Regions:
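Short, small-residue-biased leader/transition segments that mark boundaries at the very start
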Residues: 1-7
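Short C-terminal tail/terminal secondary-structure segment
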Residues: 225-231
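Glycine- (often His-adjacent) and acidic-residue-rich active-site loop
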Residues: 18, 29-63, 79, 109, ...
Length: 231
């Protein structure tokens, strides 16, 4: 995962967010690896001043986390180091049975540097995060699901079709409601419970001004599928 790939990811997210016809993005890699981490050969000669001036890694990757539309991480094979951090920037992770997660940067004499220590701790707690970050061990998909890092596991054979079905289910909803709900959930990690509930209530009330709310509730009463217009 070199700098060119990071820039490409940022541009893809920019285009996705601007395109009104797109309602859900799947971020994935190959069957063997979601992403096996940063390009170590590219990193090796860098100095402190190099990485500081470049805002190395996070400058482009954080665009995934800041996207207002939903992004699903579809993890098959290895998601190590920066790959695991990139997956955690997505809204939720779906893993294949063969998926493996890890933050092995400690083996290189450094720490995670793209949000790994912060997001991992929020997702799975201090003890498990310390375990992964200090030992560099890999975590199997089953363990990742059991502690909440992964939302669900799909079979290797049906993985691609299964993830696409999930994305279609997300995309079928009102994009306005989806974006607001995403904003609410993300706020839970950054504020107190009382403030979070107030924030949720304000956005919930604002949805009553949308045409999609009118359509969604009318469709429910009339026992038909809603036709959302994202308005």
């Amino acid at each position: 995962m070199g700098s060119e790939m990071c820039i490409r990811d940022r541009l893809e997210v920019d285009n996705y967010e601007k395109d009104e016809s797109l309602r859900c993005m799947i971020l994935t890699g190959s069957e063997k690896a979601f992403a096996a981490g940063a390009d170590i050969k590219q990193m090796q000669p860098k100095t402190y001043m190099d990485v500081y001036k470049e805002d190395f890694i996070t400058r482009n990757w954080e665009r995934v986390a800041s996207c207002r539309k939903p992004i699903i991480a579809a993890v098959s094979g290895y998601a190590l180091g920066g790959g695991c951090e990139l997956a955690m920037m997505c809204d939720f992770m779906v893993a294949s049975e063969s998926a493996k997660f890890g933050q092995p940067e400690i083996n290189l004499g450094v720490s995670p540097g793209a949000g790994g220590t912060q997001r991992l701790t929020r997702f799975i707690g201090k003890s498990k995060s310390m375990d992964m970050c200090l030992t560099g061990r890999m975590m199997e998909a089953e363990e990742a699901e059991s502690i909440g890092l992964v939302s669900r596991i799909l079979s290797n054979d049906d993985f691609v079709d299964g993830v696409v079905d999930i994305a279609k289910e997300v995309a079928d909803k009102s994009l306005v409601a989806t974006m607001m709900t995403k904003e609410m959930v993300n706020r839970a990690y950054e504020t107190t419970l009382a403030e979070g509930v107030r924030f949720e209530r304000r956005l919930f009330h604002s949805m009553f001004a949308t045409k999609d709310k009118t359509e969604g509730m009318a469709a429910f009463v009339e026992k038909r599928k809603p036709e959302f217009k994202d308005e």
